[in-house]
From Swiss-Prot:
Membrane-crossing residue ranges in chain numbering: 709-729
UniProt keyword NAD, yes or no: no
Annotated organism of origin: Arabidopsis thaliana
The protein, known as: Glycerophosphodiester phosphodiesterase GDPDL5
Catalytic activity, EC: 3.1.4.46
Catalytic activity: a sn-glycero-3-phosphodiester + H2O = an alcohol + sn-glycerol 3-phosphate + H(+)
Positions annotated with a glycan in the UniProt record: 88, 162, 218, 227, 285, 302, 390, 401, 507
Membrane topology value: Single-pass membrane protein
GO cellular component: membrane
InterPro entries for this protein: GP_PDE_dom, PLC-like_Pdiesterase_TIM-brl
Gene Ontology MF term list: glycerophosphodiester phosphodiesterase activity
Intracellular or extracellular location(s): Membrane
Top-rank taxon: Eukaryota
EC class: hydrolase
Length: 729
């Protein structure tokens, strides 16, 4: 009996050790990676401002270190400022217009008291400019409990002005809690080696771009990265641009990771990675998700960096504490939120294609959506837009001659509409990936452009057979009145026929939820009448930003729908990317009246979020789920929300405070006030009944698209006749 007991204890011990080993960090110390806030929360407030440093304490924990780019004034006072020149990052040019170049050594500490800080990155909020003064290093030290990281970028510059950066740093390290001192200059680090206690303050060699030359050795930083044993003689760690670890090619795709972290750890060097910011362009592999990028440096199964230098410290802080070491297959869902795709995973693949749906299902979407369009031969299929120009390469084909203006749909621009082509013609087109507005400068995965194929509604209804994790499907029906009145096509009947056929074929679709969504009450009423659909299966979509919903409108909606879709701006109204108030009460009002509330559209790109969410799509999701308590998220990046549902610290951190950033703004820089969004009234919901389709459209009344299609070929025919005539003459 003793032997089995011993074996059992051995197995238990082995299991515990194996679990501990597998869950330990692959950092040099075995502890979680550190987070260093570069100039405070410099992604939001001006770098090195008191607001930037204070926001770090509000959004993270005392463990997060504050970074100070140390500069010296003419009278030797140490200040925190991101650049040698004061021009970029302050309003010094308005204070003293006489200097061509303005450095901190040109001013005494007292003279700098009138200089205010400004945002140095043009894409970031400028409304906080000219509010905060430059801080002395002693003032910054009072704001942190964990200690400071001092960066000395150019000690030789100050030596030319008879100022000793070394002496200043030594003095500061004796008076203040300085955890790390970094510099790209080897001579400076060597001079500091015997002046600080390595158990208290660590010296870190900062790498610049690989082609740049380090002055002491006259070697490139790229070559020095291959001589880590030499680096170990004067430092205890390295700070490298992230591309040293995960290279990115010219097309913005990741290359295989290097062995730098592993090699450095073998030499006893810590590795800190830099150049992280939520509003920087990152490799397409990350789908514009900053948390995914951080996780690739710490949770890849091969190595982990020892820390991050970030302009948005809340994101790496939560990536480390909430999303690392989470097994997506085994982890339980913490957040109760339904994920509905927006044209599939249309952030990664062309929308409404087989590949977009496949990615959405594998990424964790609960419900796949199909925006139903109709072909000329009355076949319903899935496509994100009524206009083929928006979703396909039709403009590159001979079908471009079918361009027409349909005033009922878009009176300002011509289009090539789905009802102008047969299904077989549409299937010859290549799908194109949807991008944000052109002026954003952000493009979605170009390698996936023109990948995949569009699905007919019949094929779409079979997807639950392929992806067993799905809870249901959502079918969106728009432009039904136009199609009936002008094209003689009943999209409602076409959808009902496909639903009946799918049920008859017993393809298991009937066992899953089918939702019908529309912006038109008349469409939803028609489904309710013809198919006896329960109002819980009908979803009413509000296609405008609204600030309130009248009680009479809610009562009307409840008669024909059980769910409602509203925009993000209807919940958190914002202008110039700054939320104007904490939140409206729309969601709670709708929910208290028994309606499920879905919100659209959630994307990963930083330009789609209000600044109050710190350019972090995960923090935005958290606010809508925990604060507003919506029922579902409609997203073109389902993976981001699916990962959020399984985070380890759900509910442990405080909610992101919305509507308060504006109180820190410079009133002179705020945009002018605008009229609030309108309220949704009963008159906005009420519509005349949807007419029945004609049996056949009148032969004498071709559509405008057909007129255009006939007109262009006729011109070619006429030209051919004339050519033949002149040849014969």
């Amino acid at each position: 009996m003793a032997c089995p007991r011993v074996i059992f204890l051995i197995l238990i011990t082995f299991f515990i050790l194996q679990t501990a080993f597998s869950s330990s960090w692959q950092t040099l110390s075995g502890k979680p990676p550190a987070v260093i806030a570069r100039g405070g929360f410099s992604g939001m407030f001006p770098d090195s401002s008191i607001q930037a440093y204070q926001l770090v304490n509000i959004t993270t924990s005392p463990d997060v270190m504050l970074w100070c780019d140390l500069q010296l004034t003419k009278d030797g006072v140490g200040i925190c400022f991101p650049n040698l020149k004061l021009d970029n990052g302050s309003n010094v040019i308005r204070i003293d217009p006489h200097y061509k170049e303005r450095f901190s050594v040109d001013f005494t500490w007292k003279e700098l008291s009138d200089v205010k800080l400004a945002q140095g990155v043009v894409s970031r909020p400028y409304i906080f400019d000219d509010v905060s003064s430059i801080l002395a290093i002693e003032e910054v030290a009072k704001l942190t409990a964990s200690g400071l990281w001092l960066n000395i970028q150019d000690s030789a510059f100050y030596a030319k002005h008879n100022l000793s950066m070394r002496n200043s740093v030594v003095s500061l390290s004796r008076r203040l809690k300085v955890n790390f001192i970094s510099s790209p200059g080897i001579s400076f680090l060597k001079s500091m080696k015997n002046s600080v206690k390595p158990t208290v303050t660590k010296l870190i060699f900062r790498f610049l771009k690989q082609e740049h030359i380090e002055p002491f050795t006259n070697q490139s930083y790229g070559s020095l990265a291959k001589n880590l044993s030499y680096i170990r003689t004067f430092s205890s760690g390295i700070l490298v641009p992230k591309s040293y670890i995960w290279p990115v090619d010219s097309a913005l795709y990741l290359q295989p990771h290097t062995s730098l972290v592993t090699d450095a750890h073998k030499e006893g060097l810590q590795v800190f990675a830099s150049e992280f910011a939520n509003d920087f362009v990152i490799a397409y592999n990350y789908s514009y998700d900053p948390t995914a990028e951080y996780l690739s440096f710490i949770d890849n199964g091969n190595f982990s960096v020892d820390g991050f230098l970030s302009d948005f410290p809340v994101t790496p802080y939560r990536a480390i504490n909430c999303f690392s070491h989470v097994d997506p297959k085994r982890a339980k869902e913490q957040a109760k939120i339904t994920i509905i795709s927006k044209n599939g995973a249309s952030g990664d693949f062309p929308g409404c294609t087989d590949l977009a749906y496949q990615r959405a299902a594998s990424d964790g979407a609960d419900i796949l959506d199909c925006n139903v369009q109709m072909s000329k031969d009355k076949i319903p299929f899935c496509m994100s837009s009524f206009d083929l120009i928006n979703s396909t390469n039709v403009i590159e084909t001979s079908f471009r001659n079918l361009s027409s203006v349909v005033s009922e749909i878009n009176p300002r621009r011509s289009g090539i509409y789905t009802f102008s082509l047969t299904m077989s013609q549409i299937q010859t087109l290549k799908p194109t990936i949807s991008n944000l507005e052109k002026d954003s400068g952000l493009f979605r995965n170009p390698r996936n452009n023109k990948a995949g194929k569009f699905l007919t509604l019949s094929e779409f209804l079979f997807l639950p057979n392929r992806y067993s994790s799905l809870l249901g499907l959502l079918i969106e029906v728009e432009n039904a009145a136009y199609l009936v009145e002008h094209q003689g096509i009943s999209v409602v009947d076409a959808v009902l026929d496909e639903l009946k056929r799918a049920t008859t074929q017993q393809n298991k679709t009937s066992a899953r939820t089918i939702l019908i969504q529309s912006t038109d009450k008349s469409v939803l009423m028609k489904f309710k009448e013809k198919n006896k659909m329960n109002h819980d299966e009908l979803v009413y979509r509000v296609d405008d930003n609204i600030r309130d919903v009248a009680d009479s409108a809610i009562k009307d909606i409840k008669n024909f729908a059980g769910s409602i879709v509203i925009s993000k701006k209807s919940v958190f109204p914002y202008k110039g990317f700054i939320i104007l108030e904490k939140e409206t009460n729309i969601a709670s009002k709708l929910k208290s009246n028994g309606l499920r509330v879905y919100v659209e559209r959630f994307s990963n790109e930083c330009v789609t979020h209000a600044f109050d969410f710190y350019d972090d799509p995960t923090l935005e999701i958290d606010s809508f789920v925990r604060d507003v308590q919506i029922d579902g998220i409609i997203t073109d990046f389902p993976a981001t929300t699916a990962r959020y549902r399984k985070n380890k610290c759900y509910g442990e951190f405080g909610l992101t405070t919305t509507g308060e950033l504006i109180t820190f703004a410079n009133p002179m820089l705020l945009p002018p006030a605008e009229a609030p969004y309108p309220a949704l009234l009963d008159s906005d919901v009420t519509e005349p009944p949807l007419p029945e389709a004609r049996s056949q459209p009148p032969a004498s009344s071709p559509s405008k698209a057909e007129e255009k299609a006939i007109e262009v070929p006729f011109a070619f025919i006429a030209m051919a006749i004339l050519v033949c005539f002149f040849i014969s003459v």
